[in-house]
């Protein structure tokens, strides 16, 4: 990752869990070359298929796990706006076309957003919504659930389908 703050949280959580086999690296993934290839790599909502495969081929000696969105709509829009990012189905089609063997698993996960107040919810939809219209307060309130927690009294649920692609770095052709 390139975020020092995010990596500090990861390091802290790994230390607290006693996970000595996790190493957080702050670098540019596409240019770094480890002295020893990683046993495994995990890419969660990260990268286009070709660039991910090139990074795996250069840096990994074992399996790579690619977590991709399995849904086609933007999760924080008040309308059913299509998501613009690459998704699970497209990544599988690209791997098949490249003749890279893989297996998959699909699952659902809650990917919602906690919110501190109704005005925060309105700002959130204004910033991340894709409809191009000002957010409608009644529509927003209809989508929120109350949590009973003082710090985040509202939650915008967003249960989404995800897909995990598992492949072996040794199966990635040099031509990619």
PLM-predicted stretches and their roles:
Residues 84-99, 103-105:
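Short alpha-helix
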Residues 105-176:
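Conserved Class I S-adenosyl-L-methionine
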Residues 30, 38-54:
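A short SAM/SAH-binding and catalytic strip from SAM-dependent methyltransferases
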Residues 18-29:
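Conserved SAM-binding strand-loop segment of SAM-dependent methyltransferases
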Residues 61-75:
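Conserved beta-strand signature within the Rossmann-like core of class I S-adenosyl-L-methionine
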Residues 10-11:
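Conserved SAM-binding loop
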